[in-house]
């Protein structure tokens, strides 16, 4: 009976159906995925985002990748700077420039923008910090770029330090990117005297940027003003993250996960100030419930970027979660019938869109336990979270593609 009810509640996977399911047209529309790097899911994302750009006027596409590296991609899709190969190699973190789905998205954005005036072009943004699971970047790029921007536009006496002072305090970049620091807090330079002084200087530089707002906005373009604000958020966020890497308390990993998602949330809110944004990331970074993970230190929990943004934007934020049936090449086979994914797998469609209320009704109470994943890279949807999800995309089978 539940399956029959869901059959009547399933909608086509397209932009028009999605917008009709939402309570309001969101300023920030986020599509989550339960695993990374599968081109089946990336192709569906590309299809939906193209429709939302063309039919609903969204003008920024933001992905879970390095916000500074993403500037190269944005320059390419808006102006043609660089080659596609170059921006895929240098404009993405986490190795995601190698995914065919991401390459196809960038190629489409460039073609879409080529004959359009600036106001109609689609922008690209990374909204993650310059962070990897194994290490964090040096704050050098963000700090020196912010200092250079201010030094060219305000009285030198207002600057809290010289570029030479920053360079001396930063030291060699490999001190900051040491991969041993992720497992051993004693290897981190995040709480060294130099790092402490840099945190104060970064705060002073951001304060100067804000204090000079009337002058800087009057003498720069909107894009030129967005860039130093990004540098400021990234510099302070990275220095905060490095300080947490040096933490020896049991809360260390929870704090690091929370700080990463705080960087993400701040970047998303800044992008939303510019106009409607489409977002793609892991479900765990976009959900409204607390995110959880088991790591080498034990269980970790934190508020995701989606939870933080939702608390600020209300109905102007929408979260569309993705669920899937199988990833057979990763050992994820047909889901048990008593799980959320098992119920959806009984539907005839290869892909569909469902209102969360319909899913909750079909599952009934008490809701089933989450599906147990046989592969660490896939996180099934938690039925207990349905009340905080605006809509759900279900993909029956994720298949291996040549890029994998």
What are these regions (language model features)?
Residues 1-404:
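Structured catalytic-domain cores with a bias toward divalent-metal coordination
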